[in-house]
Amino acid sequence: YVVTRVGQNGQSEYYNVEEYYRVRYTNTRMYLLNFERTMEEIFRGENDSISGNSILLGIRSKDVEYQTNESGKVVTFVQEGELWSYNQEANTLAKVFSFRGYEGVDDRENYGEHDIKIVNIDEAGSIDYIVYGYMNRGIHEGTVGIAVYHYDSLANTNEEQVFIPSSQSYEVMKSELGQLMYVTESGAFYIMVDGNVYGIDLNSLDTKVLVEGLSDEAVAISESNRFLAWVDPSAVRGSDTIHMIDFSTEKVTDVTGSASDYVKPLGFMQEDFV
């Protein structure tokens, strides 16, 4: 639920609150075994949000999804389902992406079954990022999937590069999305969704499917996400060949056993394949 209060500057402040109760019932009474409450402030980007070299995000968890450009002069961060960008030299704060409007908070806009992952940020402050989960509004409203966006900081414009629909729930997507996400210096972006590996050229916006139908039990990903090893989905428990792709070159190498051996990827030790 949402709570609101009037801040010191007279502006309305909004907070998303979640409560967790663990109870046990008997024939005679009810016991409260555990209670937890979390509160996250909906960042509004008001004038008092910046103090010296700090951005005051308000009440929230200490784990902030953020990235800076190489010089450290531009920082982009995620707060309660919104993406923001702050330019230290210009002392400007921009809301890059949000499903919410600027006046108040309603249930449709504030439905929190989505999240944002920052892919990269260049020296000019332009950002590539993905929005995944349930789409609250826009042309994909009511669907679940992954949208890849590019924000041009000079023009202050957002462009959707590709939308990948998904049959998974937001919670499943959230747990699986971190499995594979890799960006090359040339601007190629790789991501795995629903067992399919997609390659997206962030310059031309071309999208292709590299691998389809992967099973979790027959996939291994290196620590940097640069390498992916897998066996054919049709032979998960009886394959004599492991395929391994290097996303920096898209080169595929096959590792084979003897005629009577089956092979299976176990994992990586950093970048070394096991």
Describe the function of each predicted region.
Residues 64-86, 117-148, 178-193, 225-236, ...:
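Short beta-strand elements that form the blades of beta-propeller/WD-repeat-like
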Residues 28-57, 83-109, 140-172, 192-212, ...:
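Surface-exposed loop/turn elements that mediate protein-protein interactions on large endomembrane-trafficking
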Residues 3-4, 247, 262:
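Hydrophobic pocket-lining residues within nucleotide cofactor-binding pockets
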Residues 1-29:
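Exposed beta-sheet edge and beta->alpha loop/turn motif
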Residues 199, 205-230:
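Long, well-ordered mid-to-C-terminal structural blocks that present hydrophobic/aromatic surfaces
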Residues 59-67, 104-121, 167-182, 212-224, ...:
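Repeated scaffold domains used in trafficking and secretory/extracellular systems
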